[in-house]
């Protein structure tokens, strides 16, 4: 395939997909390549972890159109306490009443589902997965990758 796009993004995880969506909002096309199978990454029970999404990252998710899909699945971070193992003392972070929250918590699976759904609907994103990158080349004129499919 010799389809030219504005961006080549190697890695379609939370960051890569968010980058592709943000770029698409600005009119940039991308090839988004990942070796993992999207079906397994979004399967029930694959990843029980959750991520703390900062206020700035939440604004980015809202900007790329994920708010409506994600909002019912998250919860506000009202305060953060930082402890250093068994040492005495701790740091407490609490926003002022006019500042809102410190961010939101989401299950990683929910983040992936929302990102995959949004990327699938975006014509400026060409999604390639699961596929291995066999080689890549960077030059003063651009970048290219040879995929294993």
Question: Which residues are covered by each model-predicted region?
Answer:
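N-terminal Rossmann-like FAD-binding beta1-loop-alpha1 element of flavoenzymes
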Residues: 5-32
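Long, low-complexity, intrinsically disordered polar/charged segments
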Residues: 1-9, 32-34, 40, 141-142
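Glycine-rich FAD pyrophosphate-binding loop
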Residues: 24-49
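N-terminal FAD cofactor-binding segment of flavoenzymes
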Residues: 45-84
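Short glycine-rich hinge loops at helix-strand junctions in the catalytic core
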Residues: 27, 65, 124
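Conserved N-terminal helical subregion
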Residues: 73-149
